[in-house]
C-alpha cells in the first residue's frame, strides 16, 4: 500500500491526527546537517501532513518546522537531550517516538548518498536499536497502523485508560526509572516534557553504566 493509501485508510478510520502539509522545498526538510534528504516515501507523507500522531498521542511521527508534530531538526540537535546520552544517540536521526520515549530513527553515516532507509526503534532506557521496517512506507503501514489500531503493549493500553490522550510534546516516564530498579507500576509513572524525559533517561543510563563499570 502506498503512503497516500495508508494515510487515507488511517484517516477514514479516525486513527490519526494530522497537521497541515510541510514545505518540502525548505532547508528544514533535509535529513541531517550532512545534507541527506528524507526518503521519498517519508517526504511524501510530510507533503500531505507535517507529522502525525496516533492512538491518542501515544505514537508520533515528527515533521519539519514549527508547525509540525515536532520539528525533527530541533529534536535531533546535538546540544539538546542527545547530549545526556554520552554518545549513544550519535549516528541516528530520530523521526518519531512512542509516549514512553522509545525512538524511531534512521541510521546515519558520513556519505548522504549511501543512506539506509531501514526504520529502527531504540528503547527509551538504553537506546538499544532493533529494525522494525525496511522502509518508511512499511513502517507507516505496519508499525504505526498496527499500534494505532491496537497497541501490542498492554502497558500502553492501560496507560491510556489512566492518563487519557496525550499531547505529542509529553512523554510518560517511570520514577524512579526501570533501569535504576523502579517498579513497572503505573502508579510510578509521571508526565514530563519530552526533552526533560529523554534527558533524565540519559542521566539514568549514564549513572547505571558508571556503577556497573566501577563494580566490574
Describe the predicted segments one by one.
Residues 1-106, 110-111, 161, 165-216:
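A surface-exposed partner-binding patch
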Residues 115-152:
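Compact, glycine/acidic-enriched structural inserts
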Residues 144-172:
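Short aromatic loop motif centered on NTY/YTY
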